[in-house]
Amino acid sequence: MAAQRRSLLQSEQQPSWTDDLPLCHLSGVGSASNRSYSADGKGTESHPPEDNWLKFRSENNCFLYGVFNGYDGNRVTNFVAQRLSAELLLGQLNTEHTEADVRRVLLQAFDVVERSFLESIDDALAEKASLQSQLPEGVPQHQLPPQYQKILERLKALEREISGGAMAVVAVLLNSKLYVANVGTNRALLCKSTVDGLQVTQLNMDHTTENEDELFRLSQLGLDAGKIKQMGVICGQESTRRIGDYKVKYGYTDIDLLSAAKSKPIIAEPEIHGAQPLDGVTGFLVLMSEGLYKALEAAHGPGQANQEIAAMIDTEFAKQTSLDAVAQAVVDRVKRIHSDTFASGGERAKFCPRHEDMTLLVRNFGYPLGEMSQPTPTPAPGGRVYPVSVPYSSAQSTSKTSVTLSLVMPSQGQMVNGSHSASTLDEATPTLTNQSPTLTLQSTNTHTQSSSSSSDGGLFRSRPAHSLPPGEDGRVEPYVDFAEFYRLWSVDHGEQSVMTAP
């Protein structure tokens, strides 16, 4: 009967009520599922995707964003995404609320979600206890007679139903102020455009066994913080705060590492950061799951993932026409860097045999989008676009962005060099300053100052530094291929024969 009741409740949840909530079109999401690589470099999915996200706006101009990273199944992340929306978007927040009110509502919402999930598995836990009482005591499961096989199968199904947990990072925008609530290891970054470049700030702290504040909290409960830090994980996870995971919530006294705790050591209480004023800010907000920055750290080493991801987003803003495309391009790029590092067999390959699900949410605050998004820019009136292929060296790093330039031929009367008419040339000619920037990074704790420049080689600095040897004819192999340019020029001007590059 309990199983039938749960099945009915689950069927009633399809489709989700959140399907009718208005989406925020000032944000975009990209994602990739987990991968494990075999010796030949082929990747396969280790488990069904466990990440989730949300990006909604309410009628009272409140915006809600979230990225959720699950483990041991996706039930918890799905539950949290739906229930948290209900606890924050049904009138609980409004423009009359003070900063203290918003923080209180966020804390209350996480508490309700945690309690509601644990209550939702009560029936399964009761059924599990009932079935376990029917098994003979002291007999290992693999030695049980065949008549207990159905009970064992049902116990396995129940374990899958009640297992798992989730980490969450949530952002609320209300009254031009940003609030971030975090449980676990997902991250929130605020990237601001300044006169000195792109300022990258991590708004939350990772709740891990490396976090000294978390280790102190656990030590106050009577636990050995040094041993926890040495172990690095608690019941298979680095996080010290999580939603769900009934095993560590209900059974921590049976876990050697946690048994001495005076109260529940693994909690779902979020840390609230903010309010962060957004008036006059130009930039973007980043919410990302642990899998994204961990994959990049595996390939490039720890310490610079935030800055690298922010720089990738900055580059894609100039190339893409939608925020979804921006986020997906960055996720795809990190995924490619990770797989290429494994395939290279180099020093970092041993750190890249697999990666978890990756999710990236980007919320725009007036940052220029799509300045170089068109593969063939619109020419000035009377002009024509002639492509010029500029191949980068095959030896370049996969973390750099290759660029295809387009040469816009102006109409007569416009000057190519020096001054030009103010009619349309500025709009027609793409700006290249955002492509393949040189980043100057200065990091202190969670704050990073990132400056972009192209003065030390510009777009072509990835060209090999050594001189290319001349060929048999005494000429160096051309760097820029004008063949397509000459062909189109000849067609437009009625030439009988197609010119070729010298």
Swiss-Prot record:
Null mutant phenotype: Mutant mice die in the late stages of gestation, exhibiting edema and severe embryonic hemorrhage.
Membrane topology summary: Peripheral membrane protein
Regions of compositional bias (Low complexity) in chain numbering: 438-455
PTM notes: Phosphorylated at all three sites Ser-421, Thr-429 and Ser-436 by MAPK14 when cells were exposed to cellular stresses, or stimulated with TNF-alpha, IL1 or LPS. These phosphorylations inhibit TAK1 activation by a feedback control mechanism. Dephosphorylated by DUSP14 at Ser-436, leading to TAB1-MAP3K7/TAK1 complex inactivation in T-cells. Ubiquitinated by MAP3K1 with 'Lys-63'-linked polyubiquitin; leading to activation of TAK1 and of JNK and p38 MAP kinases following EGF and TGF-beta stimulation. Ubiquitinated by ITCH with 'Lys-48'-linked polyubiquitin; leading to proteasomal degradation. Ubiquitinated by RNF114 during maternal-to-zygotic transition; leading to degradation.
UniProt-annotated stretches for the region Disordered: 1-21, 414-476
Record site feature (Required for interaction with MAP3K7), residues: F482
Localization in the cell: Cytoplasm, Cytosol; Endoplasmic reticulum membrane
Keywords assigned by UniProt, alphabetized: Cytoplasm, Endoplasmic reticulum, Glycoprotein, Membrane, Phosphoprotein, Ubl conjugation
Database matches in Pfam families: PP2C
Biased composition (Polar residues): 7-17, 414-437
GO cellular component, one term: endoplasmic reticulum membrane
Domain PPM-type phosphatase: 28-365
Entry-annotated residues carrying Phosphoserine: S7, S421, S436
Annotated function: Key adapter protein that plays an essential role in JNK and NF-kappa-B activation and proinflammatory cytokines production in response to stimulation with TLRs and cytokines. Mechanistically, associates with the catalytic domain of MAP3K7/TAK1 to trigger MAP3K7/TAK1 autophosphorylation leading to its full activation. Similarly, associates with MAPK14 and triggers its autophosphorylation and subsequent activation. In turn, MAPK14 phosphorylates TAB1 and inhibits MAP3K7/TAK1 activation in a feedback control mechanism.
Assembly with partners or alone: Interacts with XIAP and BIRC7. Interacts with TRAF6 and MAP3K7; during IL-1 signaling. Identified in the TRIKA2 complex composed of MAP3K7, TAB1 and TAB2. Interacts with TRAF6 and MAPK14; these interactions allow MAPK14 autophosphorylation. Interacts with STING1; interaction takes place following cGAMP activation and promotes TAB1 recruitment to the endoplasmic reticulum, triggering MAP3K7/TAK1 activation and STING1 phosphorylation.
Protein name in UniProt: TGF-beta-activated kinase 1 and MAP3K7-binding protein 1
Organism of derivation: Mus musculus (Mouse)
The gene coding this protein: Tab1
